[in-house]
Amino acid sequence: MNRMEQHPILTFDKGRKVTFTFEGKTLEGYEGESVAAALHANGVRVLHESEVKHRPRGLFCAIGNCSSCLMKVDGVPNVRTCVEPLREGLRVERQEGHAHPKLDVEIESRLGERRNLIETDVLVVGAGPAGMCAAIEAAKGGAKVILVERGQKLGGQLVKQTHKFFGSEKQQAGTRGVTIAEGLEKEIAENPNIQLWVNTSALGYYANGIVMVERDHQVEGILPKRVIVATGAFEKNLVFPNNDLPGVYGAGAVQTLMNLEGVLPGKDVIMIGAGNIGLIVSYQLLQAGVNVKAVVEAAPRIGGYEVHAAKLRRAGVPILTSHTVSYAYGEGKLEGAVIHQLDEKWQPIPGTEKDIKADIMCMAVGLSPLVELFFQAGCEMKFVPELGGYVPALDDCRRTSVGTIYAAGDASGVEEASSAMLTGKIAGLSAANDLAAVDGFEEKFADYRGQLQMLRQGPGGAKIRSGVEKLKEGKCVDYAK
């Protein structure tokens, strides 16, 4: 078993022990944890095969964005097992590629009565730091809010963060992300203006402002007066041979397994990327008892804060700048990787190859905003590399070119969690004020904007400031409609 029994910071509140079957074999897990986590805890890393070449596939993102975890569950194909809750008696099977069930021409006669649209003042999509703060702020302003979250747990990146936050007292400096998430969840539970829907995915934005969602395997239609999109971001990968082997994870997936599910991803890890995420997750891996063999960074210097790098160096972890991955290797799963040094022109230096044995490779090489809903709604989109890719054009209230839609958090540009919370507060406050004047709006708005600008000061915020300025001035690539 690969479950963590002890952690220096976290405690794992496991649900009821249940049994399920994988390929006919009976296994044990805990009710409510993801199917993929339960399989990992039982030593199952290969979840399905690729469609054409039948290559093994394993968990990568662990938040429902990629297709690496698709499996057949209780006979239903293409289930995202990284967000599918485990229940007693589930039947889990591998599948080859994306299953293509036969077209059921009689399905319409079995769908039952069409459901009425559910109306609300504000719909918030995503219950990470931005979405939670947006929902709370809109509800405080008097709006009726539906907050949807495709996973079972609230908090997004916050519940994965065991380190203490920087900033000022207003940004809860000195408080761990997991503790901040608990406080926000309590506020949501106690606010009668907020309906919380977990296990709910936004499927699309349709004509007349209707948002269709899948809630516990049932499709619902929501007609909100305002929509706040706080869908977060997805992790990038690098291109190198065998980058798809089971054991190659996004950094967020490793955090999800360790810090949410209490499951060890493996024994030995190579971390790719020395930004804040790579450095922080490396230290979290050490806390969980995983051996960090090296942190590999292509740039000539680390991109994260020195305070995070210093912790790793004190623990004896080598940080190899001007290095990258040549290739990974392994029979059906990761067994190691060869890295090499780069010259000043980012070209490989012959003879510098190093072979590192590891069963985990953790990719912390950047994030891109999740923006599909903005595209579907016809929002004006811009490509801003400093913000992670395509983002919606916004005014100071976080309002998009479609006046009823707002953006918050990493969906509008990848930043730190503290910034995401503030953009959520601005979006929630503005959406509520659009519907009915909020008492003290100007003072609150100015306060949140001021805090956000303060967080973006200094060398660490230069990239974000540049991206925001480009977006505001239109000095970026337009999305071709």
Language-model-derived ranges and their functions:
Residues 1-23, 30-481:
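Residues forming the flavin
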